[in-house]
Amino acid sequence: MGIRAIVVDTAGTTTDLTFIQDVLFPYSVKALPDFLAQNQHNVLVENCICDTRDIALEPDADLARVTEILQQWVHEDRKATPLKTLQGLIWKQGYAHGEFTGHIFPDFIEAVNRFSAQKLRIYSFSSGSVEAQKLLFSHSDGGDLTEMFSGHFDTRTGNKLDKQAYANILNTISLSPKQVLFVSDVVEELKAAEAAGMMTCQMVRDSKQRTGDFRTINSFDELVID
């Protein structure tokens, strides 16, 4: 049967965690107040504001309070969909203005070209929004990589720690579990993917990283698909 598609996690796998934590997250925290004030009547932004009130169980929260809630969620690394959607919109402005470029490990840039040449389908699955993933890969240090991807998945597909999210991916891409390899640095995500029947491989870029009972690699250079 063989592997026909590779699904990659982003932070810690294709992208340095420090870029997310030290560049993207602080940028979104700083930009949130002005962005919400200027765009609160945009339909998408307005929906995110309403969803934030619902999730926080604060239906009467004013814009200042909504901003506080969202900023707190960033500090807590909450995977709330309205936050991730707003971060994607904010980062879009940052990329467009040249505030930063998307960090991608060089070994993944090489590998994505290799996998594409092998006619393998490549997908990303992140708690960051699909929009944020597209921005990361289109404004990467290695240029625009988006044409190499067959698709992207985010929290709308499901929680990355939940088996059902991976079952949903399989249903969307119409492949059997053993035809799909999921690569992540997070043990719990790999367990969920394995429970859905996917093949798995753990990316271990940090020697102090917690590992599980999975095949491990230290870079995509070591990932060879026959």
Swiss-Prot record:
Top-rank lineage group of the source organism: Bacteria
Necessary cofactors: Mg(2+)
MF annotations from Gene Ontology: 2,3-diketo-5-methylthiopentyl-1-phosphate enolase activity; 2-hydroxy-3-keto-5-methylthiopentenyl-1-phosphate phosphatase activity; acireductone synthase activity; magnesium ion binding
Pathway: Amino-acid biosynthesis; L-methionine biosynthesis via salvage pathway; L-methionine from S-methyl-5-thio-alpha-D-ribose 1-phosphate: step 3/6; Amino-acid biosynthesis; L-methionine biosynthesis via salvage pathway; L-methionine from S-methyl-5-thio-alpha-D-ribose 1-phosphate: step 4/6
SUPFAM superfamilies registered for this protein in UniProt: HAD-like
Enzyme Commission number(s): 3.1.3.77
GO aspect biological process, one term: L-methionine salvage from methylthioadenosine
HAMAP family hit by this protein: Salvage_MtnC
Entry keyword annotation includes Ubl conjugation: no
Family: Belongs to the HAD-like hydrolase superfamily. MasA/MtnC family.
InterPro entries: Enolase-ppase_E1 (IPR023943), HAD-like_sf (IPR036412), HAD-SF_hydro_IA (IPR006439), HAD_sf (IPR023214)
Gene3D superfamilies (alphabetical): 1.10.720.60, HAD superfamily/HAD-like
Keyword terms of this UniProt record: Amino-acid biosynthesis, Hydrolase, Magnesium, Metal-binding, Methionine biosynthesis
Entry's cofactor comment: Binds 1 Mg(2+) ion per subunit.
Lineage summary: Bacteria, Pseudomonadati, Pseudomonadota, Gammaproteobacteria, Alteromonadales
Subunit structure comment from the entry: Monomer.
Catalytic activity field: 5-methylsulfanyl-2,3-dioxopentyl phosphate + H2O = 1,2-dihydroxy-5-(methylsulfanyl)pent-1-en-3-one + phosphate
Family annotation (CDD domains): HAD_EP
Role summary: Bifunctional enzyme that catalyzes the enolization of 2,3-diketo-5-methylthiopentyl-1-phosphate (DK-MTP-1-P) into the intermediate 2-hydroxy-3-keto-5-methylthiopentenyl-1-phosphate (HK-MTPenyl-1-P), which is then dephosphorylated to form the acireductone 1,2-dihydroxy-3-keto-5-methylthiopentene (DHK-MTPene).
Protein name (Swiss-Prot/TrEMBL): Enolase-phosphatase E1
